[in-house]
Amino acid sequence: MLWHVIKNLKLTIKETYYSLVKEFGTNDPLKIIKELGIIVQFANLGENKGLYHTLKIDNITYHCIHINNNLSSKEQRYTLAHELGHYILHKGSNLHFLRRVTNTPLSRQEIEADLFASYFIVSDEEIKEINNLTYISESYKLNYRICEKRLEYIFN
């Protein structure tokens, strides 16, 4: 698995999250996305949770995020933050990111986007206070390994 690869990115991802929140005065991923001029569309995406891609028309590049409107509001918030993570962390990589409902192995970019999104969902203080990874993972609908990494980063 690629968990060791993101170890050196932990501060960058965390610092990126905090700098965005400071710059935009909110931790609402939808508000940040709109302020960045990213096009957001909610639609029935079937088994897909969300999608980030770019579209080039007449030498103008548009950044687009599509979110499945069948997701709960919590899942939509997480998916918005996840796709924002792709925009922030992987901009210019010429990759299209499609988030499916299935639990397939994650690429480095998916792990990074999940880690980034987790900061929008649960704070370091809450993780320290609760200190129960299974509870955090289930309550906040986060990947257990992401919760492990967050806890590891807090105490290391």
Protein language model features and the residues they cover:
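Active-site hotspot residues in diverse enzymes, especially metal/ion-binding acidic/histidine motifs
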Residues: 1-156
